[in-house]
C-alpha cells in the first residue's frame, strides 16, 4: 500500500500459543487499523493547517457508550463540623471495630453529642463522598460499593521547607522521595511535591505521573540559610542564643557574649555599650529568623487552603531541619498562625506528619552547628535546650493536626511507608454546634476518648476556629459580576480538580512519523446526553465550546486550540440510541520534553463546563535509545464530520478516549517500537521481545509470555506491534496495561502504561 510515496507493509507477528483469556494476537482488523493510523499521521500537515487557519472547524465523531446510573444521596446539615481520628493500642496497632457509643466527644471540655460516625478506608470512593465538601456540606452516597471505583487512591503531599534544609538533609530527602516514587506510589495515588521557596514551580501540583514527580525532585536546590550578622563580632550567635538573650532566660549566655564583645573592643570601651550591642545583635538575628519562619508558615497555610479543593483525606509530610516556635516578644506571635494552620488543616481534611531531616540528632549542638565554645561552661545549658527547641514547631504542627513527628533517625523513607500503613483506616465523626459558646470568636479545643480504654491513644486535630473567627482570617472579597463565558472556560482550564458538569474525557497520544517527526494527538470526548439542545432548522442541535493547551514543564503554553462543535441529536433524548459521545481530535507537532495537556468544554446553552488534564513525556529519539509510542487502546471505525477539503464521510480509525470497556469484550492495543538495534553493521533484523501485563491496585494479575516481535516492514525505525487481550475473566474495576519491550542486542528496556476501566 503506497501512501504519499511511503511504502507500508502489513504486519506479520509470530506468537506462541497462550490461554484464551489472555490472548495476544494480531487480527486483520488490527492490521488495517495500523495502516489507517499511519495514513492519518502522514497527512498531518493538512490537519494542522486547517486547525490553525480555521479554528471553528468541527471534527466530530460518535460512538456508543452505556449510560451510568446516578447515586442515591443523603444530605447532611451544612452546620456539621467533622473530623477524622485514629485509635491505637499500646503496640501502635489501629483499633478496629469501635462503635459510636464507645466514643466521648468534648469541645472546650464540655460534652458534645456525636451526630455522625463511620469507619473509613483511606482512598476509597466512600471517603471521597464523605469528605467531598470542604465547608462541611456533606453529600453522603448510600453504601453501595462497586468494583469500578472501590479504590480512589491516596492524596499525599511532601512539603519541603527548603529554607530550613542543609545540604545533607536535602540529600536524604531526595533519596526518600525517589524511593517513594519508585516503590510506594500507587496506581490511583495523587501526589504533590511542594517547597517553601517555590523552586518546583509549575510541577508543584497533584499528579500520579512518575516522570513529573522525578522532575520535581530534580528541581530541589539548597538555599543557604542567610541569617546575617550585621555587626563586627566574629563570635557566632545562634537564633536560640539570641532568643535566650532577648528573654533574659540565662544570664550566663548574656555575660558570655558581652565578654566576647569586650575582647575585641577598643581599650576602655564601656561594658554598658557592649551590653547594648549584644541585645541589638540578638534582636536583629531574631527579626531575620522570624521573617523566614513566617514565609514557611504562609506557604504551609496556603497549601492547606489549596488542598481543600481536593476531596478526600490528605497526608502532608512536612520535611525540615526545624526552627524556633517563638522568636521573641518583638515579633509576631506564631501561635496565632499555628491555630490558623490547624483550622485550615481540619477543614481541608489534612493530617501533617513532620520529619526532622537532620536525621540522627542528639539534641545537643556542637561546633559543627556554629555554636561557640565557652571554657567556663556558661553556654552548656542553653546548648542542651537548643536542639529540642528547634523541634518544638515540628512537634506542634504534627500534634495539633492529628499526626506524628519523626525525630532522630537517618532512614525516614521507612517511616513514610509506616505512616501510609497506619493511616490506611480511620474513624470519621461529626457534630453540630448547638450553643452560642461554640460559635464564639475563638479557637475551639477538640478532645475525644474511648470510654473504658484509657490505654488507647487517640490522634486527631486538636481544634478549629469558629465560623466567625475563621471568616476573620480570610481576606475580604468584594462582590464580583458573574463571569463571562471566556472566564468560565479559563477557570475550568486551570482548575485543580476536573470539572464534571459536562463529562469530559481526555486522551493524549505520542507517535513518531517519517515526515513530521514527533506528533501529539489530543482527543477530547464529551457525553452527548448531558448537553442542552435547541431546535435549529427542525433539528435538535447542541453547541459545545472546546479550548485546550499543551504546556511545557515551565508552565509555558507551546500550543493552544479552540473550536465550537455543533452536535445533532440523532434520536429522542433519553433513548438508548442517544447515549453517545462526541470526540474532537487535534494534532500538533511536538518536541521532546515533559508536557501537560489541559482541555475545557462548555455547553453554550446551559453554561455548564467540564475539564480534564493529562501529562505526557515525549522521548528524545535522536539519542537512539529504545523507546515506545503511547499505547493506543480500543478500536472502532467511525465517520468523520470534517468539512471541505477532506474526505467527508470516509470511515476512519478512532481509538478509545475514555478507556472504558465492557466485560466479556476484547481489548485491542497498538504501540510502535522506536530505535531497535540492528547489529553493528545496521543491516540485521531487530531482535526485540515484548511482554504485556495487566495490573490492578499495583498487583500483577495477568502476564503474557515473552514474545519475539517478528515483522516485515521497510521502516525498522518504527516497528508497529498490536495485540488483543480477552477481558472475559476480569471483574469490573480499574486496571493498568503495561507493555514492556526488550532489545536483546543492547539489553535495553522500554515500557509504556495505560489505564483502562472494565464496566
PLM regions: where:
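Methionine residue identity
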Residues: 1-2, 24
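Extended hydrophobic/Leu-rich segments
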Residues: 2, 17-18, 31
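Scaffold/interface architecture of coatomer-like assemblies
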Residues: 49-759
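Acidic, Ala/Val/Gly-enriched low-complexity intrinsically disordered segments
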Residues: 11-23
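Positively charged n-region of N-terminal signal peptides that target proteins for export
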Residues: 24-31
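Bacterial N-terminal signal peptides
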Residues: 33-45
Amino acid at each position: 500500500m503506497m501512501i504519499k510515496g511511503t511504502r507500508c507493509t502489513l504486519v506479520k507477528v509470530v506468537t506462541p500459543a497462550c490461554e484464551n483469556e489472555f490472548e495476544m494476537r494480531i487480527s486483520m482488523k488490527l492490521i488495517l487499523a495500523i495502516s489507517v493510523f499511519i495514513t492519518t499521521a502522514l497527512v498531518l500537515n493538512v490537519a494542522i493547517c486547517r486547525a490553525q487557519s480555521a479554528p471553528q472547524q468541527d471534527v466530530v465523531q460518535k460512538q456508543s457508550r452505556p449510560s451510568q446510573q446516578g447515586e442515591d444521596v443523603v444530605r447532611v446539615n451544612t452546620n456539621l463540623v467533622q473530623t477524622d481520628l485514629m485509635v491505637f493500642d499500646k503496640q501502635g496497632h489501629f483499633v478496629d471495630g469501635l462503635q459510636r457509643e464507645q466514643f466521648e466527644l468534648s469541645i472546650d471540655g464540655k460534652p458534645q453529642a456525636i451526630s455522625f460516625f463511620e469507619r473509613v478506608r483511606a482512598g476509597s470512593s466512600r471517603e471521597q463522598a464523605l469528605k467531598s465538601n470542604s465547608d462541611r456540606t456533606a453529600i453522603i452516597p448510600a453504601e453501595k460499593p462497586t468494583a469500578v471505583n472501590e479504590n480512589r487512591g491516596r492524596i499525599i503531599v511532601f512539603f519541603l521547607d527548603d529554607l530550613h534544609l542543609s545540604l545533607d538533609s536535602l540529600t536524604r530527602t531526595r533519596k526518600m522521595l525517589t524511593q517513594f516514587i519508585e516503590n510506594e506510589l500507587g496506581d490511583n495515588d495523587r501526589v504533590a511535591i511542594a517547597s517553601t521557596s517555590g523552586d518546583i514551580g509549575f510541577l508543584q501540583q497533584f499528579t500520579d505521573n512518575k516522570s513529573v514527580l522525578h522532575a520535581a525532585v530534580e528541581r530541589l536546590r539548597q538555599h543557604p540559610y542567610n541569617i546575617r550578622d550585621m555587626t563586627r563580632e566574629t563570635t557566632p550567635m545562634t537564633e536560640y542564643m539570641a532568643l535566650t538573650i532577648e528573654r533574659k532566660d540565662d544570664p550566663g549566655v548574656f555575660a558570655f557574649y558581652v565578654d566576647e564583645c569586650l575582647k575585641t573592643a577598643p581599650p576602655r570601651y564601656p561594658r554598658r555599650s557592649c551590653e547594648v550591642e549584644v541585645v541589638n545583635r540578638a534582636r536583629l538575628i531574631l527579626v531575620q529568623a522570624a521573617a523566614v519562619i513566617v514565609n514557611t508558615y504562609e506557604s504551609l497555610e496556603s497549601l492547606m487552603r489549596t488542598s481543600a479543593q481536593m476531596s478526600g483525606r490528605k497526608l502532608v509530610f512536612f520535611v525540615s531541619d526545624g526552627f524556633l516556635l517563638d522568636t521573641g516578644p518583638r515579633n509576631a506571635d506564631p501561635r496565632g498562625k499555628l491555630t490558623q494552620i490547624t483550622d485550615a488543616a481540619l477543614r481541608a481534611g489534612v493530617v501533617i506528619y513532620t520529619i526532622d531531616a537532620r536525621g540522627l540528632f542528639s539534641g545537643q549542638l556542637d561546633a559543627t552547628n556554629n555554636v561557640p565554645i565557652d571554657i567556663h561552661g556558661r553556654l552548656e545549658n542553653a546548648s542542651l535546650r537548643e536542639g529540642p527547641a528547634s523541634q518544638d514547631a515540628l512537634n506542634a504542627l504534627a500534634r495539633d493536626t492529628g499526626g506524628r513527628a519523626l525525630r532522630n533517625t537517618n532512614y525516614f523513607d521507612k517511616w513514610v511507608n509506616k505512616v501510609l500503613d497506619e493511616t490506611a483506616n480511620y474513624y470519621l465523626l461529626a457534630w453540630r454546634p448547638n450553643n452560642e459558646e461554640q460559635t464564639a470568636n475563638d479557637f475551639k479545643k477538640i478532645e475525644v476518648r474511648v470510654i473504658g480504654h484509657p490505654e488507647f491513644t487517640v490522634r486527631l486535630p486538636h481544634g478549629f476556629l469558629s465560623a466567625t473567627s475563621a471568616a476573620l482570617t480570610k481576606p475580604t472579597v468584594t462582590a464580583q459580576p458573574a463571569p463571562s463565558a471566556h472566564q468560565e472556560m479559563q477557570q475550568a482550564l486551570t482548575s485543580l480538580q476536573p470539572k464534571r458538569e459536562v463529562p469530559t474525557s481526555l486522551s493524549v497520544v505520542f507517535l513518531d512519523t517519517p515526515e513530521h517527526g514527533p506528533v501529539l494527538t489530543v482527543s477530547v470526548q464529551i457525553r452527548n446526553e448531558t448537553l442542552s439542545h435547541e431546535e435549529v432548522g427542525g433539528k435538535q442541535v447542541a453547541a459545545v465550546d472546546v479550548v485546550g493547551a499543551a504546556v511545557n514543564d515551565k508552565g509555558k503554553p507551546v500550543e493552544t486550540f479552540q473550536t465550537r462543535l455543533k452536535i445533532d441529536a440523532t434520536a429522542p433524548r433519553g433513548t438508548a440510541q442517544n447515549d453517545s459521545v462526541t470526540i474532537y481530535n487535534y494534532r500538533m507537532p511536538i518536541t521532546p520534553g515533559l508536557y501537560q495537556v489541559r482541555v475545557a468544554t462548555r455547553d453554550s446553552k446551559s453554561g455548564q463546563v467540564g475539564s480534564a488534564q493529562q501529562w505526557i513525556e515525549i522521548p528524545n529519539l535522536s539519542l537512539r535509545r529504545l523507546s515506545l509510542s503511547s499505547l493506543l487502546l480500543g478500536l472502532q471505525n467511525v465517520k468523520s464530520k470534517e468539512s471541505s477539503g477532506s474526505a467527508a464521510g470516509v470511515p476512519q480509525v478512532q481509538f478509545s478516549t475514555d478507556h472504558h470497556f465492557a466485560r466479556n469484550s476484547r481489548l485491542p492495543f497498538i504501540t510502535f517500537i522506536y530505535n531497535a538495534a540492528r547489529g553493528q553493521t545496521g543491516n540485521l533484523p531487530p531482535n526485540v521481545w515484548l511482554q504485556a501485563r495487566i495490573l490492578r491496585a499495583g498487583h500483577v494479575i495477568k502476564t503474557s509470555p515473552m514474545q519475539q516481535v517478528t515483522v516485515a516492514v521497510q521502516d525498522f525505525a518504527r516497528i508497529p506491534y498490536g495485540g488483543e487481550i480477552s477481558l472475559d475473566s476480569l471483574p469490573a474495576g480499574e486496571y493498568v496495561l503495561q507493555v514492556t519491550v526488550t532489545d536483546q542486542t543492547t539489553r535495553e528496556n522500554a515500557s509504556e502504561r495505560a489505564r483502562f476501566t472494565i464496566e
